[in-house]
From Swiss-Prot:
Chief location bin: secreted
Propeptide segment residues: 21-50
Disulfide bond annotation, renumbered to this chain: 53-65, 54-61, 58-64
Organism (species): Conus tessulatus
Full protein name: Conotoxin TsMMSK-B022
Homology family: Belongs to the conotoxin M superfamily.
Amino acid sequence: MMSKLGVLLTICLLLFPLTAVQLDGDQPADLPELRAQDFAPERSPWFDPVRRCCSQDCRVCIPCCPY
């Protein structure tokens, strides 16, 4: 009886962390199309070097300046 309980406890302890924690590969990329292009906002024509953000078109240039 005790050995069955030990086996059950071991199985539960081994399986729980594997299903409870997301792996890095499961995390969605926030902007995969920009990462694939090796995007640097400093090279964007809308990048404001003084404010260190983009003044136009937030879909293309990130970080966006607050209005």
